[in-house]
Amino acid sequence: RGVCYNAKNGGYIDNVPGTWSGEGRGSFPSGGTTTFEVDDNAALVEENFNDSEYTGFRISSAHSINDDWEMLITHLDQDLSADGVFDYDPAKGDLLVSRFVEDTLDDSFSQTSLTLEGRLGKLDALYTGAYLERESEQQVDYSGYANVGAWLPYYVCNYTAYNLCGPATVSVELLDDNQRTTHEFRVSSNEVSDLPFSYTAGVFIDESILETENDYCYLGTDHPYASAGTWAAYQANNPLPGAWSREGRVRRPACRFFNDLKRTEEQTAYFAEMTFPVSDKLDLIVGARKYDLDVDYTGQSKFGYRGSNVANGRDYDVSGDHSADPL
């Protein structure tokens, strides 16, 4: 059996004209002696800008191996593309918002699963397993950070005078890569069993890997105001030496902070249950469970100062439970 689909959803949020600067926000200078560069979103103004499109397929095949065994194989594949945001700014009006960085999302996954079900004499047996791969790339307008980001003026103004401030526009670029494998095997007694009780027992195994990159890009660092101070111009933001990195890539100068992380999780669960009939109306059930979980966390959080490209940040290969040092 197979099915293909394509669904296009129209938007209902309007991205309307607006301006943005650091003036009057967060820890930016106040008092009227600072010149602020003002950003506008004229290039991004659009009606109904939060549209999305789903494209995918699902195929499955069931097979009777013999009188005792059956097999089912299924594969799913989907791509999602979405633009805009799905909330609005009441200060702008109903279903209206002003965004200053293009909001985009591309999300794709594929999953293959297998189920085997059958009989081994006096036992019913079941195995089911699946493998998932998912990758998403997203860009988000994070300019609201200017309202709370205490250090943003350091990056976009002329340090140390702070009388010239570049745009307070911020974008976040996100990449997530996820892999997950699951297995479950269980057996249970069936109607031909001659035991005085019935039982079920099995094991479940789940292994997952998440690799994620989050780049926080202060777009005002590219403005002449940001390099008009007493410090040198920004350099590219290198990863921490020796720490795990998904690609080891150097971020452009505007991306002053990034997370580059890998999280692995392995869990194993054992379970068993026995049912003893005490009478026609009463059963005694005895069960046991054992569960093991192992989580590992490696990678880095990196931030770049002005001037020299020094190794500022946190190396989770060292502090992420790989030593006695706390996070």
What residue spans do the PLM features occupy?
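Outer-membrane beta-barrel signature, preferentially recognizing the C-terminal barrel domain
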Residues: 97-112
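Solvent-exposed loop segments that connect transmembrane elements
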Residues: 10-47, 83-100, 141-173, 215-260, ...
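Face-selective signature of the C-terminal outer-membrane beta-barrel domain
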Residues: 74-76, 109-136, 167-308
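Transmembrane beta-barrel wall of Gram-negative outer-membrane proteins
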Residues: 1-82, 110-111, 178-182, 190-194, ...
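Short acidic/glycine-rich loop or secondary-structure boundary segments that cap or lie
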Residues: 82, 136-137
